[in-house]
Amino acid sequence: MASVPHFTVFLFLACALGIGANVTRRATSSCPKGWTHHGSRCFTFHRGSMDWASAEAACIRKGGNLASIHNRREQNFITHLIHKLSGENRRTWIGGNDAVKEGMWFWSDGSKFNYKGWKKGQPDKHVPAEHCAETNFKGAFWNNALCKVKRSFLCAKNL
Protein backbone atom coordinates (compact mmCIF):
# COMPACT_ATOMS: atom_id res chain seq x y z
CA MET A 1 0.00 0.00 0.00
CA ALA A 2 2.88 2.36 0.72
CA SER A 3 3.91 2.19 -2.93
CA VAL A 4 0.58 3.66 -4.14
CA PRO A 5 1.08 7.06 -2.42
CA HIS A 6 4.69 7.21 -3.70
CA PHE A 7 3.48 6.47 -7.21
CA THR A 8 0.79 9.16 -6.90
CA VAL A 9 3.35 11.72 -5.73
CA PHE A 10 5.73 10.68 -8.53
CA LEU A 11 2.94 10.96 -11.12
CA PHE A 12 1.91 14.37 -9.78
CA LEU A 13 5.50 15.70 -9.89
CA ALA A 14 6.10 14.29 -13.37
CA CYS A 15 2.96 15.98 -14.67
CA ALA A 16 3.76 19.26 -12.94
CA LEU A 17 7.32 19.30 -14.29
CA GLY A 18 6.08 18.35 -17.75
CA ILE A 19 3.56 21.19 -17.75
CA GLY A 20 6.23 23.61 -16.54
CA ALA A 21 8.59 22.54 -19.33
CA ASN A 22 5.81 23.03 -21.86
CA VAL A 23 5.07 26.55 -20.57
CA THR A 24 8.78 27.41 -20.77
CA ARG A 25 8.94 26.19 -24.36
CA ARG A 26 5.93 28.33 -25.31
CA ALA A 27 7.31 31.40 -23.55
CA THR A 28 10.59 31.28 -25.49
CA SER A 29 8.72 31.13 -28.81
CA SER A 30 6.37 34.05 -28.12
CA CYS A 31 6.81 37.70 -29.01
CA PRO A 32 8.13 40.30 -26.56
CA LYS A 33 5.71 42.75 -24.96
CA GLY A 34 4.54 45.32 -27.51
CA TRP A 35 5.09 42.96 -30.45
CA THR A 36 2.37 41.02 -32.31
CA HIS A 37 2.87 37.45 -33.52
CA HIS A 38 2.09 36.49 -37.12
CA GLY A 39 3.46 33.42 -38.89
CA SER A 40 7.06 32.89 -37.83
CA ARG A 41 7.70 36.53 -36.95
CA CYS A 42 6.85 39.28 -34.49
CA PHE A 43 5.82 42.78 -35.58
CA THR A 44 5.71 46.13 -33.81
CA PHE A 45 4.32 49.42 -35.14
CA HIS A 46 5.88 52.76 -34.22
CA ARG A 47 3.69 55.84 -34.53
CA GLY A 48 6.58 58.24 -34.13
CA SER A 49 7.93 59.55 -37.41
CA MET A 50 11.47 58.90 -38.64
CA ASP A 51 13.22 58.90 -41.99
CA TRP A 52 13.72 55.41 -43.49
CA ALA A 53 17.37 54.94 -42.36
CA SER A 54 16.63 56.06 -38.79
CA ALA A 55 13.59 53.75 -38.69
CA GLU A 56 15.73 50.82 -39.88
CA ALA A 57 18.34 51.63 -37.20
CA ALA A 58 15.59 51.73 -34.54
CA CYS A 59 14.34 48.30 -35.68
CA ILE A 60 17.89 46.89 -35.58
CA ARG A 61 18.27 48.14 -31.99
CA LYS A 62 15.14 46.12 -31.16
CA GLY A 63 16.60 42.98 -32.76
CA GLY A 64 14.79 43.21 -36.10
CA ASN A 65 14.53 45.17 -39.32
CA LEU A 66 11.90 47.20 -41.09
CA ALA A 67 9.25 44.66 -42.09
CA SER A 68 9.53 42.62 -45.26
CA ILE A 69 6.29 41.37 -46.82
CA HIS A 70 6.22 38.03 -48.65
CA ASN A 71 2.58 37.38 -49.56
CA ARG A 72 -0.89 38.87 -49.64
CA ARG A 73 -1.79 37.32 -46.27
CA GLU A 74 1.11 39.14 -44.60
CA GLN A 75 0.13 42.37 -46.35
CA ASN A 76 -3.45 42.04 -45.08
CA PHE A 77 -2.21 41.34 -41.55
CA ILE A 78 0.12 44.37 -41.64
CA THR A 79 -2.56 46.69 -43.02
CA HIS A 80 -4.97 45.55 -40.30
CA LEU A 81 -2.32 45.86 -37.55
CA ILE A 82 -1.39 49.42 -38.55
CA HIS A 83 -5.06 50.43 -38.73
CA LYS A 84 -5.79 48.83 -35.35
CA LEU A 85 -2.86 50.59 -33.65
CA SER A 86 -3.06 53.99 -35.38
CA GLY A 87 -6.79 54.27 -36.10
CA GLU A 88 -6.11 54.89 -39.79
CA ASN A 89 -4.42 53.44 -42.86
CA ARG A 90 -1.28 55.42 -42.06
CA ARG A 91 1.52 55.48 -44.62
CA THR A 92 4.28 53.46 -42.97
CA TRP A 93 7.88 52.57 -43.80
CA ILE A 94 8.59 48.93 -44.65
CA GLY A 95 12.00 47.41 -45.41
CA GLY A 96 12.10 47.67 -49.21
CA ASN A 97 14.68 49.84 -50.95
CA ASP A 98 16.40 50.20 -54.31
CA ALA A 99 19.19 52.56 -53.20
CA VAL A 100 21.95 50.26 -54.51
CA LYS A 101 20.57 50.06 -58.06
CA GLU A 102 17.52 51.87 -59.41
CA GLY A 103 14.66 49.44 -59.95
CA MET A 104 16.35 46.50 -58.17
CA TRP A 105 14.44 46.18 -54.89
CA PHE A 106 15.81 44.49 -51.77
CA TRP A 107 14.50 43.87 -48.27
CA SER A 108 16.66 45.30 -45.49
CA ASP A 109 16.44 41.96 -43.63
CA GLY A 110 18.13 40.20 -46.56
CA SER A 111 15.11 38.03 -47.41
CA LYS A 112 14.01 37.38 -50.98
CA PHE A 113 11.92 40.13 -52.61
CA ASN A 114 9.38 37.55 -53.82
CA TYR A 115 6.11 39.47 -53.44
CA LYS A 116 5.22 42.90 -54.76
CA GLY A 117 2.30 44.96 -53.48
CA TRP A 118 2.90 48.12 -55.51
CA LYS A 119 0.04 50.47 -56.40
CA LYS A 120 -0.52 50.46 -60.16
CA GLY A 121 2.12 52.72 -61.71
CA GLN A 122 4.51 52.22 -58.77
CA PRO A 123 7.35 52.18 -58.23
CA ASP A 124 7.65 55.18 -60.48
CA LYS A 125 10.66 57.18 -61.54
CA HIS A 126 8.88 60.52 -61.22
CA VAL A 127 11.38 61.58 -58.58
CA PRO A 128 14.70 59.75 -59.14
CA ALA A 129 15.65 59.70 -55.43
CA GLU A 130 12.57 57.72 -54.28
CA HIS A 131 14.45 54.64 -53.07
CA CYS A 132 12.42 53.54 -50.04
CA ALA A 133 9.16 51.58 -49.80
CA GLU A 134 6.10 52.56 -47.79
CA THR A 135 2.85 50.67 -47.37
CA ASN A 136 -0.74 51.95 -47.07
CA PHE A 137 -0.35 54.21 -50.09
CA LYS A 138 -3.87 54.89 -51.47
CA GLY A 139 -5.16 51.81 -49.68
CA ALA A 140 -3.06 48.79 -48.78
CA PHE A 141 -0.56 49.33 -51.58
CA TRP A 142 3.15 50.13 -51.70
CA ASN A 143 4.78 53.27 -53.02
CA ASN A 144 8.39 54.30 -53.53
CA ALA A 145 9.09 57.49 -51.60
CA LEU A 146 11.92 59.82 -50.66
CA CYS A 147 13.86 58.13 -47.85
CA LYS A 148 14.27 61.41 -45.96
CA VAL A 149 10.50 61.79 -45.45
CA LYS A 150 9.48 61.10 -41.86
CA ARG A 151 6.92 58.31 -41.48
CA SER A 152 5.65 55.84 -38.93
CA PHE A 153 7.36 52.47 -39.34
CA LEU A 154 6.87 48.76 -38.84
CA CYS A 155 9.58 46.47 -37.45
CA ALA A 156 9.67 42.69 -37.74
CA LYS A 157 11.87 39.98 -36.29
CA ASN A 158 11.97 36.22 -36.49
CA LEU A 159 10.87 34.12 -33.53
From Swiss-Prot:
Pfam families: Lectin_C. Expressed by the venom gland. GO terms for biological process: inflammatory response. GO terms for cellular component: extracellular region. A motif (Galactose-binding) lies at residues 122-124. The keyword Plastid does not apply. SMART domains: CLECT. InterPro entries: C-type_lectin-like, C-type_lectin-like/link_sf, C-type_lectin/snaclec_domain, CTDL_fold. Its main location: secreted. GO terms for molecular function: carbohydrate binding; metal ion binding; toxin activity. Not glycosylated. Induction: Hemagglutination is completely inhibited by galactose. Is not inhibited by mannose, and the chelating agent EDTA. It is found in: Secreted. Residues 22-24 form a propeptide. Ca(2+) binds at Q122, D124, E130, N143. The keyword Secreted applies. Residues 38-156 form the C-type lectin domain. Monomer. Galactose specific lectin that exhibits hemagglutination activity (minimum hemagluttination concentration = 2.5 ug/well) in a calcium-independent fashion. Has remarkable pro-inflammatory activity, inducing neutrophil mobilization in mice. Plays a crucial role in the innate immune system and chronic manifestations, especially in neutrophil mobilization. Belongs to the true venom lectin family. This is Galactose-specific lectin nattectin.
